[in-house]
UniProtKB/Swiss-Prot annotation:
HAMAP family, per database record: RecF (MF_00365)
Keywords noted in UniProt: ATP-binding, Cytoplasm, DNA damage, DNA repair, DNA replication, DNA-binding, Nucleotide-binding, SOS response
Keyword Signal appears in the UniProt entry: no
PANTHER family the record matches: DNA REPLICATION AND REPAIR PROTEIN RECF
Domain of life: Bacteria
Lineage: Bacteria, Pseudomonadati, Thermodesulfobacteriota, Desulfuromonadia, Geobacterales
Its job: The RecF protein is involved in DNA metabolism; it is required for DNA replication and normal SOS inducibility. RecF binds preferentially to single-stranded, linear DNA. It also seems to bind ATP.
Record's protein name: DNA replication and repair protein RecF
Annotated InterPro entries: DNA-binding_RecF (IPR001238), DNA-binding_RecF_CS (IPR018078), P-loop_NTPase (IPR027417), RecF/RecN/SMC_N (IPR003395), RecF_2 (IPR042174)
Residues annotated for ATP binding in this entry: 30-37
One Gene Ontology biological process: DNA replication
Family recorded in the similarity comment: Belongs to the RecF family.
Locations listed in the record: Cytoplasm
A GO CC annotation given for this chain: cytoplasm
Length: 365
């Protein structure tokens, strides 16, 4: 899959730009706050309708503009398509080949994009919400059903929490059963994904840091470590919610379930966020992202688009070189933002396009 061109209008600090891209490497450079990340954000929207920066849709619309427009010309398996996304104050509308999209399934997956940002560099040492967010994004890229299930789980969670806040025991069991069943399906999918990428993470970590390191991933869910399969997980989750019901009524919120789970990154038998050096943590995250790319390529038969948001400033020269060596061996299209082109390792890359970004304008150089 390749993004041939994009048009962006009234989006953050971008008034209007039209950009034609290289099929391999595209470098957007300029000072901070000029619009580099906004271009990556617009690309990501074409595949997900959401910002990877956790912004609300109305926050993406330029000041005093009625709506934003992002339009992409893509080439997927030899078929060219036009994807357009309108962001209005009242919601979003999508079109494919100028026809309205009525089902989300028709839109999602048209652009598979993997983001590697400074936020994700921090997930090895940060809080569990960073690792959950990474995990959910990674699974959704290869499984549209996961996104729908994720939405359903959080809808049920919201309903159950509303009952807990009101202190209503009547009807709580019905929501508990439904939430436990949806939560069990999420947990099984998360565990399956981690088991599939773990050998890849192990391989890439050794490529980066050398042999002799034992690498692992462990899904951590409070009180459910031994439950296997959807049925067992759902039953265990129901029992756990029942056991915590009095406490949850006091707090007005559901305290157990996938929305509270975590992933342990393990190096030589120790959780890396507690015991790993900064270099080990960054190597681990780099290996996890490489594994995600490799997994999606095997699953879909083609690599995703990769969005590297100012990663060169977060990695030392050796890890930058390892990442670029990996990317040179892939057939994927890569978009890189940076404030300093000299930090990039572009040696051996036969073709790339470079763009200067300043005050919301994008100029080929």
């Amino acid at each position: 899959m390749h993004l041939n061109a994009i048009a962006i209008s009234a989006f953050r600090n971008i008034d209007h730009v039209e950009i034609s891209f290289d099929r391999r490497f595209n470098v957007l450079h300029g000072a901070n706050g000029q619009g580099k990340t906004s271009v990556l954000e617009a690309i990501y929207l074409l595949g997900t309708m959401k910002s990877f920066r956790m912004a609300k849709a109305h926050d993406l619309i330029a000041w005093n503009a009625p709506h934003s427009l992002v339009r992409g010309d893509i080439d997927k398996a030899g078929v060219r398509r036009e994807i357009a996304l309108y962001l209005g104050r009242e919601g979003r509308k999508a079109r494919i080949d100028r026809k309205p999209v009525t089902k989300l399934a028709d839109f999602f997956g048209a652009v598979n994009a993997v983001v590697f940002s400074p936020e994700e560099i921090g997930m090895a040492r940060g809080g569990p919400e960073l690792r959950r967010r990474y995990l959910d994004r990674a699974i959704f890229n290869g499984d549209l059903g996961y996104l729908l299930l994720h939405h359903e789980y959080h809808r049920l969670l919201k309903q159950r929490n509303a009952l807990l806040r009101r202190g209503e025991r009547d009807g709580l069991e019905v929501w508990t059963i439904q939430l436990a069943e949806a939560g069990a399906r999420l947990m099984v999918k998360r565990r399956a994904y981690l088991s599939q990428i773990e050998p890849l993470v192990r391989q890439f970590y050794r490529d980066i840091a050398g042999a002799g390191q034992e690498v692992g991933l462990a899904y951590r869910c409070h009180g459910l470590a031994s439950a296997e399969g959807e049925r067992d997980c759902a039953a265990a989750l129901r029992e756990l919610m029942a056991a915590h019901e009095a406490e949850e009524l006091r707090r007005g919120a559901t305290g157990v379930g996938p929305h509270r789970d975590d992933v342990d990154f393990i190096l030589n038998g120790r959780v890396i966020r507690h015991h790993g050096s900064q270099g080990e943590q960054r190597s681990f995250v780099l290996a996890v992202k490489m594994a995600e790319i490799e997994y999606l390529e095997r699953l879909n038969g083609a690599p995703p688009v990769l969005l590297l948001d100012d990663i060169s400033s977060e990695l030392d020269p050796e890890r930058n070189a390892n990442l670029m060596t990996f990317l040179r061996g892939k057939r994927m299209q890569v978009f890189i933002t940076t404030t300093d082109v000299s930090t990039l390792r572009l040696e051996g890359i036969d073709t790339h396009a470079s763009f200067r970004v300043s005050r919301g304008t994008v100029t080929p150089v």
